[in-house]
Amino acid sequence: MNSFYSSIEQQQNNKYKKQPTIVVPILTDYTCAIAASYEAKAYGIKSGMSVLEAVRKYPLVNVVEARPMEYVKMHNKLVRILHRHFNRVKVLSIDEMSCDLEDITEDKYFNVSASLKSDIYKELGECMSCSIGIADNTFLAKVASDMNKPNGFTIVKSYKDLYHLKLIDLPGINTKMQKRLNKSSIYTVEDLCSLDEISLKKAWGSVVGARWFYMLRGNLDCDYGMYYKDIPTTIGHAHVLPPNMKTMEGAYTIFEALICRGLNRLTEYRLSAKKLDIFLSWKSKTSKGCYKYSSPTVTSSSNHGYWMNQAVELWKRIPYDIQGKPFSVGIRFTHTINEKDVNLSLFDLPLETFDMKKKYLLPERISFGNPDRMFNETL
């Protein structure tokens, strides 16, 4: 999907349609854009850019707070549309899906793509556009979809079709990796494709280079997304405090919101954690420092009450009269594992009971303890 988050905001709010729009995690000048509309990109505004810089580039840019639940709803609608067109659909991210064309002949590729775009337009809205790439594997198809944006359609039949691209245009190659490849005399995509498996492995310094050799040649056994972990081993959030929150009271308010967000993600991924780390950094005119504390390591727990109590106890260990002003706060749940892999105590309630409790308690917690609402009220 093209500029997924900002397109949803434009679709659901007429005043944003065809206007430069960026989406931010919270409404403050001290954050960055997580999405930018194509109208905003025309002014040089892009994802990852600070709000202050975006406003400098175009003072009238619309700054919209992210609404994750709306994006999930639109994602689910999109997946249902795809399942009507294809037998097998693999979700790569909230705005990326890979579809199997095994039962569709090559002469029907364009018609199927046009039909899919039409359904997205009718059911999701005129602001929602997608770029479709077709190739032998997911990696090449992703590259193809990025070649003509927005609302593009591209077929890549061979790695030779990529020769006109820059190395940094390929997913998985950033500026740091590009410099590393340059040291191995790899300056273009053609240079990359001309090397054998052993040479690429040497250039990467790991087996990843060998995987690239096969991905570039359309291999399905070594493809994009196959080597990313589905379940995070840590879940963390950090926040730089805005000027009006640089007090211990303000820092604690943000700290509570971060804990709630972390617990939300534990529930979302159905994870248990063994340890909680917290930190508060501070600055003064002459010095700076950071307080870091960790909870005792436990067998594993997904109990929200337990972790909230641990968070409060850890916060109490931070001196109230710190030498400077609070600058940032952060939390991190570590050693996470899937709930189904937790060894339960013989004296605890069965897992189904905990699931039942979450089923009925979670909606209340979201309604009355929404961390996003806490940010809105405090910033």
Name each model-derived stretch.
Residues 44, 54, 95, 132-133, ...:
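A residue-level signal for conserved active-site and pocket-lining positions in enzyme catalytic cores
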Residues 182-325, 341-343:
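DNA-contacting surface of Y-family translesion DNA polymerases
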